[in-house]
From Swiss-Prot:
Major subcellular site: nucleus
Biological source species: Candida albicans (strain SC5314 / ATCC MYA-2876) (Yeast)
Protein task: Component of the NOP7 complex, which is required for maturation of the 25S and 5.8S ribosomal RNAs and formation of the 60S ribosome. Required for the transition from hyphal to yeast growth.
Gene label: NOP7
Organism phylogeny: Eukaryota, Fungi, Dikarya, Ascomycota, Saccharomycotina
Any GO molecular function: RNA binding
Protein name, per record: Pescadillo homolog
Length: 587
């Protein structure tokens, strides 16, 4: 006889473990367990049968895979957490006894851990790290915009801000930016780095109200892991681009405060110094060299006079042809990389400088801001007088009227920059002039429901009549049965014959009558084809199982919902277009 298996030794009971059991097994606190799970990427699992997994109990419990918890037992960070626990006890005892010097010594030898090995485990290739960079960047930009509080220290905020600026500096330098979208939440950017599309959100720099119900301990744990990952990625990117990491920080604000130096720059400086040292020779050495050259020339002339006369031979002249020279490819592959390379932008004080600065620099443009000129006027008046502003091609403003226009400048609103980047070409400036009503700023990633307003505009004019005809056909087909339709067709033929006789008597051409017949015939053929398709659907439904029918109903519900939404949006658009036309007529 086979042995009877004990209950709870196989299946779900063995594969899953509860959170309390996992904490007991690892011998750490709940807070440390959460931190460890975040670092290692372990998350709760949902067993198919909770009752079996919980050994008969139906109480609400969080489950994890037993193998994941077994994997955590050998983690070096776990050992550091235990060391920190003993360190905290010793420090508390020393402070309780009043031994300040001992407490200070203990604090200096505080156990520290690194997440480098975890980053290498979770992201074996660089492409994996880049693919997972969306969430880390969103988190870093969120904390960079937050004020320092008792929960979030100023050090954390400054570190997040530094990493964000380093990332933006790299994207601007390598010109990786592809898409921009200004929304209510903030500004969405998309860049292509090493073939991977990375999208992140930068919130607006408004005073933020920090909610009380947010657990900042968990968020700070995620931030700790993400900042380590971004450090790794930036180091690799800067090295591959031949730039020094971390970049040198200047006192000036914005991206211009990060000077990106090449690694070869110090070597070039050394070579230049060596050349200068070679040039600074003494006068005596130079005179000796000149005398030696003169003596050599005299000897050569004597040899030429003593030698036999040689016939003068005309040598062929080889001229360099431009046809042989090949066009070198551009350093930047994307079409947006050199979009604004020929332009210099003057940004007014009413426009958000940080957003436009990043966008324009990423597309090869140059910037002069009104705020920087005002600072220069106060701090260095002599440099301000020498400043040349005649090279400015575009001025970005966000005001309804301009009192004084500078000749030679093109005045545009900020949206022109964003729309030009999204369309990857320079858009006509007339629609974006000062005081003009701007066109809608659409998302470059499209609508989640599949609605595309640009396509609808193309279809609106030509297909408006066809849509109404199709609606009438559907109404006609739905009424009546097949027998009634046959009778109607016979009646229609009699009516046609009568109409033809009447039209001939009135003097109408036969070709015009044929055209009308063709239109009516096409309508009927469309109606019959739709009916056949519906019949096929019904037959297919009959062959389906109950499970498949339910799934099909859900699918149809989703499709109908999308279609209704599209219809509502198109109706709204038509109404808006009509109102615009009426206003134009009135004006």
């Amino acid at each position: 006889m086979a042995r009877i298996k004990k209950r709870g030794t196989t299946g779900n009971a063995k594969n899953f473990i509860t959170r309390t059991q996992a904490i007991k097994k690892l011998q750490i606190s709940l807070a440390d367990f959460r931190r460890l799970c975040i670092f290692k990427g372990i998350y709760p699992r949902e067993p198919r049968n909770k009752k079996k997994a919980n050994k008969g109990s139906t109480a609400p419990v969080t489950f994890y895979y037993s193998k994941d918890i077994q994997y955590l037992l050998h983690e070096p960070v776990l050992d550091k957490f235990r060391q920190h626990k003993t360190f905290a006890k010793k420090l508390q005892k020393a402070l309780g006894r009043g031994e300040v010097s001992d407490a200070y010594k203990l604090d200096q030898h505080r156990p520290k851990y690194t997440l480098n090995h975890i980053i290498k485990e979770r992201y074996p290739t660089f492409a994996d790290a880049l693919r997972d960079l969306d969430d880390p960047l969103n988190m870093l930009f969120l904390f960079a915009n937050m004020p320092a509080t008792d929960k979030v220290s100023a050090k954390v905020v400054s570190e997040a801000e530094k990493l964000c600026n380093q990332w933006l500096a790299y994207v601007a330098k390598e010109r990786c930016l592809k898409k921009v979208f200004v929304s209510i939440k903030g500004v969405y950017y998309q860049a292509t780095v090493k073939g991977q599309e990375i999208r992140w959100l930068i919130p607006y720099k408004f005073p933020t109200n920090i909610p009380t119900d947010v657990d900042f301990r968990i968020m700070l744990t995620f931030l700790e892991f993400y900042s380590t990952l971004v450090h790794f990625v930036l180091y690799k990117l800067y090295n591959e681009a031949g730039l020094i990491y971390p970049p040198i920080i200047e006192k000036s604000i914005g991206l211009s405060g990060y000077v990106l130096q090449d690694k070869d720059a110090p070597l070039k400086k050394k070579e230049e110094k060596n050349d200068e040292e070679g040039k600074n020779l003494s006068k005596k050495e130079l005179n000796k060299a000149i005398k030696a050259d003169q003596e050599q020339q005299e000897n050569d002339e004597q040899d030429n006079n003593n030698g036999e006369s040689v016939e003068d031979i005309e040598l062929d002249e080889f001229t360099s042809t431009k046809e042989d020279s090949l066009l070198q490819p551009s350093k930047y592959a994307s079409s947006t990389a050199e979009l604004f390379s020929k332009f210099i932008f003057y940004i007014g004080r009413e426009v958000p400088l940080d957003i436009l600065e990043f966008c324009i620099l990423s597309c090869g443009g140059k910037i002069i801001s009104e705020i920087a000129i005002d600072d220069l006027k106060i701090n260095d008046p002599e440099a301000y007088k020498k400043l040349n502003l005649s090279n400015i091609t575009h001025q970005i403003i966000d005001r309804p009227k301009i009192l004084q226009k500078v000749p030679g400048r093109t005045y545009v609103q900020p949206q022109w920059v964003f729309d030009s980047i999204n369309k990857q070409e320079l858009i006509n400036v007339n629609e974006y002039a000062a005081g003009e009503t701007l066109p809608p700023h659409l998302s470059p990633w499209g609508d989640a429901g599949g609605y595309d307003p640009n396509k609808e505009v193309e279809k609106e004019d030509g297909e408006a009549e066809e849509d109404t005809d199709e609606e009438e056909e559907e109404v006609e087909i739905e009424d009546g049965d097949e027998d009634q339709e046959d009778e109607e067709e016979e009646e229609d033929e009699d009516l046609k014959a009568q109409k033809e006789l009447e039209l001939e008597a009135a003097g109408v051409k036969f070709s015009e009558i044929n055209e009308e017949d063709k239109k009516s015939h096409s309508k009927k053929s469309k109606g019959t084809s739709n009916k056949e398709a519906d019949e096929e659907k019904e037959l297919k439904k009959i062959m389906m199982s109950n499970k498949q029918k339910k799934l099909f109903k859900k699918m149809q519900y989703g499709i109908e919902k999308k279609e209704n939404r599209e219809k509502q949006l198109t109706k709204k658009k038509k109404q808006l277009n009509k109102k615009k036309e009426q206003l134009k007529k009135l004006n």
